[in-house]
A protein has these predicted regions:
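Short acidic-glycine loop/turn motifs at beta-strand connectors
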Residues: 38-39, 153-155, 225-229
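Short, small/polar residue-rich loop motifs at catalytic or cofactor-binding pockets
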Residues: 30, 143-146, 168, 217-219
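Structured, charged N-terminal subsegments at the starts of enzyme catalytic cores
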Residues: 13-87
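M16/insulysin-pitrilysin zinc metalloprotease superfamily fold
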Residues: 53-68, 224-233, 239-248
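Glycine-rich phosphate/pyrophosphate-binding beta-alpha loops
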Residues: 44-53, 150, 162-173, 237-244
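Active-site rim segments in enzyme catalytic domains, especially the processed small/beta chain
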Residues: 18-19, 158-227, 233
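Internal maturation/activation junctions in enzymes
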Residues: 16, 66-165, 177-178, 185-186, ...
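Single conserved hydrophobic/aromatic residue that forms the stacking wall/gate
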Residues: 1-12
Length: 248
């Protein structure tokens, strides 16, 4: 505890809000994955408080309404569909996701056939959808301090793991004597709902600051199975809000 206490001293000097009680009462939560399907494959990915899985599954659901085989993989139409599907996925994430211990995230509604059909119908193959229809977030400069690894051993055990410091070197505070960098994930909360000045942060009411709450992220460690249960892909990516696009 002594090194941690010294680390908190550095946090206080920078007007940080952490206390020893925050660390002593913290418990890692084991949550069920959210599951979608795409072209007869089952896609398992992370659910809230991460919004990355919601973004990814929304995009895959929308793309299933289009016959991508009709277009070349590197065609303008294919890239257009990917972009439009991801825009709608990020819209779901940014306005309806938060820590499920504090906010009722309507996962089943966001990923429902009705919602997907409604979103798919708004896509025009010949032009981009107006931003008034798909509420955008400003582009952010993503740091390179998220790491992802995917592992399968010779017995078939698989791990898809994403972890992050947030920005480069996290908060810039190291716990003395440990080499542990403290992250700056408080940055992933929405400071004020719908605040246009907060670049790229999810504006969902469920992602407001609150003691004990986990902020939204876009991490999306993913595993894909065929319907018979065989694992065919373990994937994920660093990249902040770009993670779902990298996986897709």
């Amino acid at each position: 505890d002594r090194p941690l206490s010294r680390g908190l001293g550095d946090v206080y000097k920078r007007q940080g809000l952490f206390t020893m009680k925050d660390f002593e009462s913290y418990e890692a939560q084991i949550r069920e994955p959210i599951i979608g399907s795409y072209r007869d494959n089952l896609v398992f990915t992370s659910g809230p408080p991460s919004g990355g899985g919601i973004t990814l599954l929304t995009a895959l659901n929308i793309l299933s309404y289009f016959d991508l085989a009709k277009f070349k993989s590197d065609s303008a139409v294919t890239y257009h569909l990917l972009a439009e599907a991801l825009r709608r996925g990020h819209n779901n994430r940014s306005h309806f996701v938060g820590d499920p211990d504090y906010f009722d995230v309507p996962v089943s509604q966001l990923l429902s056939k009705e919602r997907t059909k409604e979103l798919a119908k708004t896509i025009d193959l010949k032009k981009a959808t107006k931003s008034t229809v798909v509420k955008p977030l400003e582009l952010t400069t993503e740091s390179r301090d998220t790491t992802h690894y995917s592992i399968i051993d010779n017995e078939g055990n698989a791990v898809s793991n994403t972890y992050t410091l947030g920005y480069s070197f996290g908060s810039g505070v190291t716990i003395p004597g440990t080499g542990i960098l403290m992250n700056n994930q408080m940055n992933n909360f929405a400071y004020r709902y719908g605040d246009k000045k907060e670049r790229g942060r999810g504006a969902s009411t469920g992602n407001r600051f609150e003691p004990g709450k986990n902020p939204m992220s876009t991490m999306a460690p993913t595993m894909i199975f065929i319907k018979e249960g065989e694992l065919i892909l373990v994937t994920g990516s660093p990249g902040g809000s770009l993670i779902p696009a990298a996986i897709l």
